[in-house]
Amino acid sequence: MAQISTTSEHTIQTLERIGAHSHVKGLGLDDQLEPRPSSQGMVGQRAARKAAGLIVKMVQDGRIAGRAILMVGPPSTGKTAIAMGMAQTLGSDVPFTMLSASEVFSLEMSKTEALMQAFRRSIGVRIREEAEVVEGEVVEIQIDRSLTGATKTGKLTIKTTDMETIYELGNKMIDSLQKEKVTAGDVIAIDKASGRITKLGRSFTRARDYDAMGSDTKFVQCPEGELQRRKDVVHTVSLHEIDVINSRTQGFLALFSGDTGEIKPELRDQINIKVGEWREEGKAEIVPGVLFIDEVHMLDIECFSFLNRALESELAPLVIMASNRGICRIRGTRFRSPHGIPIDLLDRVLIISTKPYELADLKQILTIRAAEEEVSLKPEALEVLTRMASETSLRYAINLITTANLAAKRRKADEVEVADVRRVYNLFVDEKRSVQYLKEHAEQFMNESDEYGDIDGLNSGAPIIGRQASAGAVQA
């Protein structure tokens, strides 16, 4: 008797990455740009959100390019979250580039070149062109294969409400149809110049072909009139992409590899002239985007002098900078300045300040983060985490949500309790307890000499994190 073999079923774990700001979906403003108490993942910071909403409105109207905004506030007050909310509100049509100030320091290219490339990435060019397209509903697709299977030929029957035509298909078009999974009843558009096929949706006449449809299935009317028609097509590319494509040393392949290297300023000048001609002819329009530079105090004096000039150029995006420093040394100099930024650049920026969160706001943020990470918290555990967030930092409390959930799963519980939070609180120390431990065991650590930073400041109660001592450490 033949044996019946059974195979075990394995579930494939999908990769899910929950970022620090993945819960932010916008700025949470109403139509009058008034901030809602809790909306789109944003809580508190009403004045800062309203100011950011005003900036977004001016960007959408194209009236604030070439300006600079500085967001300042203590750590864990939502500066980066507001920038992410601005990016979500602006949408995919407006170029938004996020950059950390330490990213500009590279051995492959100069600091000013890295900043210039970030500037050019943040400026879009909307190019309009007229294309011939074939648009209609697919009636039938016939594909014939040769005996060897090397060649494929076929016929495509496509119709509108007024006419119907049969097209002969070659290998490339058959592959494109199979890639887009085009079947009878789909409404498609074929670009005659490039052969690109776009699936517009499914015809209403085929709505009852299947009992069940996917949520992404879109039903459209069968097109009317001629099959072949002229259509305005809009492409949005950044100035940096045009620079790379026209760079002889790399060419367009550098767009995929990312190894663009330095681009000559003469080439950029020629592209600016050409884009200016397209604007005058009505073929293109400039879309000023947003460049967000986080931890801007990490830039040095050469970068700041470059920003002074770049902000006043004709093609400049809106530059948003964020810093959590107070009065500290400007990198590359011996001078001290507010937020580590030179006075002449501070004179050019609009400053938005963020304030520490209140207890109710912290509780709401932790609730949103727990829902985002699919963690069920008991009310008592949420209260303990809120108190921890106010006494230590918001980031520390958010990190404890995931670890406390793991501790709850170890004891096969569905909800995180206070005992789980206390367990991980004892396992992972926060910044204040770490400093206290360092004070108690200072002699056992390898310390730097007084020339760079006096460890005795620990014993005298001098502030360490995010204050004066950190500015000295950055300069060292």
Swiss-Prot record:
UniProt keywords, alphabetically: Activator, ATP-binding, Chromatin regulator, DNA damage, DNA repair, Helicase, Hydrolase, Nucleotide-binding, Nucleus, rRNA processing, Transcription, Transcription regulation
Gene3D superfamilies, sorted: 1.10.8.60, P-loop containing nucleotide triphosphate hydrolases, RuvB-like helicase, domain II
The keyword rRNA processing is assigned to this record: yes
Residues the record lists as binding ATP: 72-80
Superkingdom of this protein's organism: Eukaryota
Localization per Swiss-Prot or TrEMBL: Nucleus
Predominant cellular place of this UniProt entry's protein: nucleus
Gene Ontology cellular component list: Ino80 complex; NuA4 histone acetyltransferase complex; R2TP complex; Swr1 complex
Record SMART domains: AAA
Record GO biological process: box C/D snoRNP assembly; chromatin remodeling; DNA repair; regulation of transcription by RNA polymerase II; rRNA processing
Entry's Gene Ontology molecular function annotations: 3'-5' DNA helicase activity; 5'-3' DNA helicase activity; ATP binding; ATP hydrolysis activity; DNA helicase activity
EC number(s) given by UniProt: 3.6.4.12
Keyword Nucleotide-binding included in the entry's annotation: yes
One Pfam family named in its UniProt record: TIP49
Reaction catalysed by this enzyme: ATP + H2O = ADP + phosphate + H(+)
Family indicated by similarity: Belongs to the RuvB family.
Subunit structure of this chain's protein: May form heterododecamers with RVB1. Component of the SWR1 chromatin remodeling complex, the INO80 chromatin remodeling complex, and of the R2TP complex.
Function: DNA helicase which participates in several chromatin remodeling complexes, including the SWR1 and the INO80 complexes. The SWR1 complex mediates the ATP-dependent exchange of histone H2A for the H2A variant HZT1 leading to transcriptional regulation of selected genes by chromatin remodeling. The INO80 complex remodels chromatin by shifting nucleosomes and is involved in DNA repair. Also involved in pre-rRNA processing.
Protein name (database record): RuvB-like helicase 2
